[in-house]
Amino acid sequence: NTSVAVPAQIWGAPIIDDDVTFFFNSGLDLGNGSEAYMFGNYSERDIDGGFYFRNPDGRGGVFTKGDGTRLIADVTGDMSGNCPTALDPSDYAGRDAVIADPNCYILNQAAPGGYTPRFIGNITDSSFTMGRSGEIANGMMAGTAYDISGSVGRNEATFGLNNTFNPSMGPDSPRDFETGSYIQLAKTFNVDLSKEYGSTSVAYGYEWRETTFSVISGEEASWKAGPYAVQGFNVGSHGFAGFSPDSAGAFSRRNYAVYGDVSNQVSEDLLVQGALRYENYSSGLDTTNYKLAFNYQLTDDIALRGSHSTGFRAPTQGQANVVNTQTTLVDGQLTQAQTLPGFKLGADQLQPEESTSFAMGIVATLGDVELTADWFNIEVDDRIALTSNAAPTAAQRAAMTAAGIPNAELIGEVNYFTNDFNTETSGLDIVATYSTNLMGGSTDLSAAYNYTDTEVSDQGNVTSDSKVKRLEEGLPNHRATFTMDQQWENVSAFVRANYYGEYYAVHADWFGTNADSAMTVDVEVTYDINESFNVSVGAQNIFDQEAEKIDGSTGAVGEGVPGNVLGAIYYETSPMGIEGAFWYLSAGYNF
């Protein structure tokens, strides 16, 4: 069966081909202290990744019905085929009889051993910025530094799904689908001005921004409801349904902002700063935020610093308008889940996130050691996140139908972006650096430690307990790195040790365990052939430290592999990844 790879399902990073990135940066001296500049980038890559394996005797909506019996299509057009309605998947003689009956059809005829879809895509990113900077020479604004610029950025993700079916099309389904595209376009215009008045520095400016999120529909076969949808077959390219014309469109928003920033050297030892920013959105949102900060030189070698600020993050146009259908795990079972704008399910329109933060720290020079230590606390209210998957209620189905969602009655699970919970994150960052001469060269040693603790202060109405646990425990509280960077005349090298503390590991957004701490080591050596050309060889996780293995809990089908984990060996949320050791060879050329 060519529809099934060996192994049937692969966990890990996708295949990336034709990965190309180009940057440029240029400037032109215009005289009198002014400069024109341009910079930009372009990148493109093809991605090919695996999806969940479709079991030929168990995948609902494809091979079986909701009651577990085999899903059989009557292809006569008038339901006169007298096809079996309660055939057990283990009855292979009955299956073969169905295959031999021209009035009946099962997808096993096209994929007798099941199949594993391949999710493919082409990703392009591009941006371009041009501007002019300098200092105003005459008039009432003489001595004012300026920077005026405009930029445009574009990201396009074109999706496809291969080696799958639109089950509702039965024997007429193609196997490969073009499912559509997302395009994000951003345009900005900035004017930034600043001037010093004795011990006081003043900065102010204006920003205009327009963002457009576009959904391009896929080919018809990727989203259409075929003739067998009414018999229980899933609609659309199975695994990631195409974007229909009903969900396609361009969704734009404009906003402008003005800001002011004042800093004053109150005394030789004390610097204070205050900033204010007002932002207005065409969607009707507006906000005013501020920042207060200080730096106090306690002694020649020790300084204290601190800040307090408020923040605001409006929902993106993508979050507010995204529509897609894909396969996901719900309570350990594969199912089709659709992501919809919340208002199409009768939920409230998305509102902005608001945050308040505090930070306090110390900067010290202790002989040849530079040390910084900062405590921080961040409270975020009305956080924007996807809800857990759940079967739509009758009221939600009615809202979906009223909003024009096609085949609403066939959608098994839904989720949507919503403002539903609040969090409080606090922690400590400590960084120490030391420079010396060792082994006939210059040596930089650095150590960094981070402690971060996140608490869900208000769970809201739709955020599940399991999601709260992932938010609070899904990342290590303790992280640390130690780096040794060595430089000789033509050779440089570094060794870095990475420490990850205990965390709550989750597999496929379904179940988890408390994972042990671990350490990885990265190394790299670079040789400068000349002033322009260099080559590097290195490794990430050189000792091949494994991620946390899935434990042998109830329902285990083998050592370290519980039931229904779809071939996974490691918990996929490991902070160090599940790929193991990665070696690389690279070359660089500086123009």
Predicted regions and their residues:
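Transmembrane beta-barrel wall of Gram-negative outer-membrane proteins
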Residues: 1-113, 117-135, 140-141, 528
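Outer-membrane beta-barrel proteins
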Residues: 1-31, 47-51, 104-125, 172-188, ...
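Repeated loop/turn-to-beta-strand initiation elements of outer-membrane beta-barrel proteins
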Residues: 33-36, 139-146, 199-202, 269-272, ...
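Outer-membrane beta-barrel transmembrane domain signature of Gram-negative proteins
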Residues: 117-123, 127-128, 137, 150-152, ...
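Outer-membrane beta-barrel signature, preferentially recognizing the C-terminal barrel domain
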Residues: 239, 243-255, 301, 311-379, ...
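Gram-negative outer-membrane beta-barrel transporters
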Residues: 376-508, 586, 590
